[in-house]
């Protein structure tokens, strides 16, 4: 499968498992307002996280970014109030609003 943009529509179903092995771009708003997301581990190959991609995921606690990541969009994780860990490599372009409202963010 060729790497490219993939967008998933979930229609308010409970999120159990998502295979993102062929994602290179996480679309805008793709997982916004998901209270069932607790941990995200993005696979190698993901280069960009779109604006508001994980906005208001209020139970999200941890994000693991791949070394391939180059950019985190505007408000990508805004108001993820339980997010405690989000570690990315030096040189990643991070919008100043990417983690706005993440009041428990330690790293």
Q: Language model features by range: what are they?
A:
Residues 1-2, 8-25, 35-48, 58-71, ...:
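Structural signature of tandem-repeat unit edges
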């Amino acid at each position: 499968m060729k790497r490219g943009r993939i967008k998933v529509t979930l229609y308010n179903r409970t999120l159990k498992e998502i295979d993102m092995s062929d994602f290179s771009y996480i679309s805008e708003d793709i997982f916004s307002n998901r209270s069932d997301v607790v941990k995200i581990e993005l696979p190698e190959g993901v280069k960009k996280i779109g604006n508001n991609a994980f906005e208001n995921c209020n139970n999200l606690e941890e994000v693991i970014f791949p070394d391939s990541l180059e950019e985190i969009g505007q408000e990508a994780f805004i108001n993820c109030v339980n997010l405690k860990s989000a570690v990315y490599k030096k040189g990643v372009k991070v919008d100043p609003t990417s983690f706005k409202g993440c009041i428990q963010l330690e790293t």
